[in-house]
């Protein structure tokens, strides 16, 4: 397994490869949210997905879905370049002395001993949870109705499955860069799908019914680049440069 991250590009061979544009990069932008306007768009998208489409949360008059964890979270979004539409969003919730991570509170409701989940051995400065990943229905479907087909080319539609993957790449490159451990409450099929994309994790507690059977998974601190297809590597490079390299530039300014 090659474990590579840093300046330049990821490569399955362990070498710095020449930059090449992914199809995803051609049509979509990924970025860390740093302004209130974009954050409200993220909350609006979450309301559309979690409240209106899936019914996981109650409908709110404001049309915004947010909670007490958002004030101590880093938010990422994917934007469709041509239209400016938010195609996906996700957050990284950080732990604190005052408030535990969302999944730990959930497990306590199921009377599971969360103290058995020992994170000290990870030697991480902090821990976080990947949550509230939201991709609206028009970007989740591979087969669109005639009306939506007028808005997207066939090549753009082929990129739709990459949106969720790019958001996970963004979260985990951020965590690796800042030496933060990351959990997520996931269905087993999502954990398997992420593994194919080079994102490995292991389950740290039992499955429970929570909008489907889900369990907390702890992500590996490295990407398994030998399992990633060339197009996925290009997306990973693009995400790293968009999220981490851009943050380095802002910090240095």
PLM regions and their residue ranges:
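Short acidic N-proximal helix/loop "leader" segments that mark the beginning
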Residues: 1-25
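Short loop segments at secondary-structure junctions
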Residues: 81-83, 138, 220-225
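Acyl-donor binding region in acyl/amide transferases
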Residues: 97-218
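A short beta-turn/loop motif at secondary-structure boundaries
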Residues: 65-70, 207-211
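Accessory, usually C-terminal, subdomains that scaffold auxiliary metal cofactors
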Residues: 198-252
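Beta-rich nucleic-acid/ligand-interaction surfaces
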Residues: 62-69, 189-193
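An N-terminal domain-start capping segment
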Residues: 1, 86-105
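Short amphipathic alpha-helix that is part of the acyltransferase structural core
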Residues: 16-64, 71, 75-82, 86, ...
């Amino acid at each position: 397994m090659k474990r590579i991250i840093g300046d330049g590009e990821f490569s399955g061979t362990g070498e710095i490869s020449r930059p090449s544009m992914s199809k995803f990069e051609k049509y979509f932008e990924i970025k860390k949210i740093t302004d209130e306007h974009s954050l409200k768009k993220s909350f609006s998208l979450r309301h559309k997905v979690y409240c209106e489409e899936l019914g996981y949360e109650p409908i709110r008059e404001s049309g915004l879905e947010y909670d007490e964890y958002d004030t101590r979270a880093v938010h990422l979004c994917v934007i469709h370049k041509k239209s400016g539409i938010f195609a996906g969003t996700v957050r990284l919730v950080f732990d604190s002395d005052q408030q535990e991570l969302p999944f730990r509170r959930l497990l306590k409701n199921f009377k599971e001993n969360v103290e058995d989940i020992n994170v000290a051995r990870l030697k991480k400065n902090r821990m976080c949870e990947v949550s509230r990943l939201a991709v609206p229905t028009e970007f989740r479907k591979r087969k669109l109705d005639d009306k939506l087909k007028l808005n997207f080319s066939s090549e753009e539609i082929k990129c739709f499955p990459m949106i969720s993957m790019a958001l996970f790449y963004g979260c985990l490159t951020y965590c690796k860069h800042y030496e933060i451990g990351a959990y997520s409450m996931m269905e087993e099929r999502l954990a398997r799908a992420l593994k194919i994309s080079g994102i490995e994790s292991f389950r740290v507690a039992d499955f429970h019914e929570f909008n489907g059977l889900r369990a907390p998974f702890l992500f590996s601190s490295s990407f398994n680049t030998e399992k990633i297809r060339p197009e996925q590597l290009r997306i990973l490079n693009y995400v790293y440069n968009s999220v981490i390299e851009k943050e380095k530039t802002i910090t240095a300014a």
